[in-house]
């Protein structure tokens, strides 16, 4: 009796737990019309979906702008109910050496599947630029042999890492970075659907940290809601683990006024929070671009200094000394010549 009661209680408890999808998947477009940005390229995919004759495709562009989603939407439009049987998707988490090309991909290409008239099986290779050169050479031959029944769609960040023989067999589509307005509109739609409490500076912070990456923006939005319940600038930067633009702005303002001691003190405060040199320099670059109070010529000089320091840091010299030298050079570039007269 007691066992039955306890099991029913546990059953109710388990049923009450709501497992929510990540918003990236929950709000992933399922038709081409819902994809944000890159209208011209999407229009070409719509023509392919309408005519039904899909060529081999290479879609390149930065992460989080809809490359894989576009291919999945195209596959759904072409195959309809036969999607599950007619599509093989391999992403970066799958082993994709020569053995996979020779065995798994070849086996799928040989498999007989009932598809709508005039349609082909589709093999989707996400992050194809991470495939080894040997695997790409093996893939080239597979593409040739099974082109009558199978089409390949490759998504990559850099198309130049795809070997030339594969590029020559494919139609290459290049996706551009999403604009801030496009990212903002999708975030507003999600906030409305999820009844999210947000502020304007919170949305601005999401856009700034995402840098055109829609996936990053949506992930940061969900993480901020889950962690704090309110999407404002401070909470977003805590979730994104990036230096606050307010602190960066204060440091750069001190540089602009030639107050080196205050600027170095602000830098030390940011450094003590544990941020890397790359994070600090990257955010300095973002903030300087938005500082309208600085004359354009001075801004260009500051951006030049920040860019040179960024290059040094990427070579491995990620020290506070490098950042301090940058701050001093920025302050010096804003000082008047008479300040140097002894």
UniProtKB/Swiss-Prot annotation:
The keyword ATP-binding applies. Signal peptide: none annotated. One of its GO terms (biological process) is DNA strand elongation involved in mitotic DNA replication. Pfam families: AAA, Rep_fac_C. One of its GO terms (molecular function) is ATP hydrolysis activity. CDD domains: AAA, HLD_clamp_RFC. ATP binds at residues 24, 36, 61-68, 157, 215. One of its GO terms (cellular component) is Rad17 RFC-like complex. Keywords: ATP-binding, Cell cycle, DNA replication, DNA-binding, Nucleotide-binding, Nucleus. Heteropentamer of subunits rfc1, rfc2, rfc3, rfc4 and rfc5 that forms a complex (RFC) with PCNA in the presence of ATP. Two other complexes exist where rfc1 can be replaced by either ctf18 or elg1 to form the ctf18-RFC or the elg1-RFC complexes respectively. Belongs to the activator 1 small subunits family. The elongation of primed DNA templates by DNA polymerase delta and epsilon requires the action of the accessory proteins PCNA and activator 1. This is Replication factor C subunit 4. It comes from Schizosaccharomyces pombe (strain 972 / ATCC 24843) (Fission yeast). The gene is rfc4.
């Amino acid at each position: 009796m007691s066992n039955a009661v306890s099991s029913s209680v546990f059953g109710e408890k388990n049923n009450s737990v709501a497992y929510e999808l990540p918003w990236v998947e929950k709000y992933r477009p399922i038709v081409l019309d819902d994809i944000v940005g890159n209208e011209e390229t999407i229009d070409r995919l719509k023509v392919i979906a309408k005519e039904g004759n899909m060529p081999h495709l290479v879609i390149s562009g930065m992460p989080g702008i809809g490359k894989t989603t576009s291919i999945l939407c195209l596959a759904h439009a072409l195959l309809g109910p036969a999607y599950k049987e007619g599509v093989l998707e391999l992403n970066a988490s799958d082993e994709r050496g020569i053995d996979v090309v020779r065995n798994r991909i070849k086996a799928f290409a040989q498999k007989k599947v009932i598809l709508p008239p005039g349609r082909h099986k589709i093999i989707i290779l996400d992050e194809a630029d991470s495939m080894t050169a040997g695997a790409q050479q093996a893939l080239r031959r597979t593409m040739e042999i099974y082109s009558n029944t199978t089409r390949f769609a490759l998504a990559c960040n850099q198309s130049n890492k795809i070997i030339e023989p594969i590029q020559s067999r494919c139609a290459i589509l290049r996706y551009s970075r999403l604009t801030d307005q496009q990212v903002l509109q999708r975030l507003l739609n999600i906030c409305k659907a999820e009844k999210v409490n947000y502020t304007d500076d919170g949305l601005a912070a999401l856009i700034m940290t995402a840098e055109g990456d829609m996936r990053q923006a949506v992930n940061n939005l969900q993480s901020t809601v889950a962690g704090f319940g309110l999407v404002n600038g401070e909470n977003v930067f805590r979730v994104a683990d990036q230096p606050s633009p307010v602190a960066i702005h204060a440091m750069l303002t001190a540089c602009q006024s030639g107050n080196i001691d205050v600027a170095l003190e602000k830098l030390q405060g940011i450094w003590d929070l544990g941020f890397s040199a790359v994070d600090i320099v990257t955010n300095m670059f973002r903030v300087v671009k938005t500082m309208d109070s600085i004359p354009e010529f001075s801004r260009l000089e500051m951006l030049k200094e920040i860019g040179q320091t960024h290059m040094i840091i990427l070579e491995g010299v990620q020290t506070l000394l490098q950042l301090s030298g940058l701050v001093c050079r920025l302050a010096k570039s804003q000082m008047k010549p008479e300040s140097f007269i002894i």
